C-alpha cells in the first residue's frame, strides 16, 4: 500500500464531473488497484475513489505533476499534486479477513443450510463469495435464476448496508452474475439501516436466531 499526504486538487471525469479544490489530503493506492482520496473527517469514507482494476499514469502540467487514475470504463481521477509532505509504501501481506462473532458465523451457516428461508426456489451458489474488497456472506440464485448477494449481521446497522452496497457495486460489474440483487439479513435491523437499504433497493430480512437453531418453524418476518 502506498500512502501519500499531499496538497492537491482532484477532478473526476466520467459519467459526471466532480471537483475537489486544493487542500491537504491523504491518497491511498492499494495493491488491489484501488485509489481513494481522504480528508481528516468523514470517518472511513473517501472524498472520491476509483475501484479496481485501474491504472496510474504520472503526467506533468508544466512543472506540476498530474496523477491520472483510469479504470477500464475510461473514467478518470486527475490528481494535481502541488506539494508532497509524505510518500511511503508498505507491504501488508495477505489479510486473514474479518472473523465473525459466534452468532453471525452460526447465522451464516444456518441460512446457507436452509437457504429456502430467503424465499421459495432459492438455491445457494457459495458461502463467503470473494470480491476485490472481501467476501460476501452468501451468493444465491432466486427462483428465476437471478443472482442474490446476502449480507448477514447480528445487529443490522448502516455500516452493514454500506458494506453490502459496495459488494453489489462490484458484483454487478461481472457480466456472468449481473444483475445482482441484495438481501440484508440480521436479528435486529435499526430503522435508519432499513430506510437506507430500502432506498437502495436492498431487501431486509429479520432473522429469529432461536427458531433457526431449532428449525421448529419456517416463519420469518420479511420486510
Curated annotation (Swiss-Prot):
One of its GO terms (molecular function) is single-stranded DNA endodeoxyribonuclease activity. Disulfide bonds: none annotated. It is found in: Cytoplasm. The keyword Metal-binding does not apply. It is an enzyme of class 3 (hydrolase). GO terms for cellular component: cytoplasm. Keywords: Cytoplasm, DNA-binding, Endonuclease, Hydrolase, Nuclease. Its EC number is 3.1.-.-. Gene3D superfamilies: 2.70.180.20, 3.40.1350.10. It holds the Pfam family NucS_N. Cleaves both 3' and 5' ssDNA extremities of branched DNA structures. Belongs to the NucS endonuclease family. This is Endonuclease NucS. It comes from Mycolicibacterium gilvum (strain PYR-GCK).
